[in-house]
């Protein structure tokens, strides 16, 4: 099933953990609608500008979230009008891509995760979410400190 010109449902629901553990990671029709909006509003414009988008984590069922230690309230669950994914574009600076996404798409939340700076432009990945009800335009940086994940606002 196509979610946008260049994105398929299979691409957004694939999960090695779900496959290994036999977890059903198939979304409901309402969740598919939310994933479609994420693809149309956020991922497709990124693809049109930057080329191939490598989605490392898209939809996660509640059971999959529990299995990987994530929250069942995560936007990756594609509930409550929202959907999220983690991605990168190989060979492109993640900060440069994230800055473009923030300024050029109707993003709800954007997190530049574990990026180590211009000297390591391919470090980390980008988390992006879309919410049909409320676009917070929140841009954060995720980093580790004292063994814990912390977040701070990204200045643009």
Set out the residue ranges of the language-model regions:
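Charged/polar, solvent-exposed surface patches and flexible loops
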Residues: 37, 48, 66, 96-103
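Extracytoplasmic cell-surface/polysaccharide-interacting catalytic and binding patches
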Residues: 1-47, 121, 145-156
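Short His-Asn-centered micro-motif
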Residues: 56-58, 88-91
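Short, surface-exposed glycine/acidic/tryptophan-bearing loops
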Residues: 62-85
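A residue-level signal for beta-strand positions that form part of recognition/binding surfaces
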Residues: 6, 52, 84, 125
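Extended, low-complexity, intrinsically disordered C-terminal regulatory tails
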Residues: 40-70
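Catalytic cores and adjacent binding grooves of peptidoglycan-active enzymes
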Residues: 79-83, 89-156
């Amino acid at each position: 099933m196509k979610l946008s010109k260049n994105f398929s449902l299979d691409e957004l629901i694939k999960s090695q953990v779900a496959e290994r553990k036999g977890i059903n990671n198939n979304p409901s029709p309402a969740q598919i609608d939310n994933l479609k909006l994420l693809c149309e509003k956020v991922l497709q414009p990124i693809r049109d500008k930057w080329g191939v988008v490598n989605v490392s984590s898209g939809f996660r069922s509640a059971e999959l979230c529990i299995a990987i230690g994530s929250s069942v309230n995560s936007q990756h669950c594609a509930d409550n009008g929202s959907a999220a994914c983690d991605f990168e574009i190989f060979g492109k600076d993640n900060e440069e891509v994230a800055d473009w996404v923030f300024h050029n798409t109707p993003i709800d939340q954007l997190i530049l995760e574990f990026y180590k700076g211009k000297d390591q432009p391919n470090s980390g990945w980008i988390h992006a979410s879309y919410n049909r009800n409320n676009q917070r335009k929140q841009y954060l940086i995720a980093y580790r400190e004292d063994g814990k994940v912390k977040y701070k606002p990204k200045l643009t």
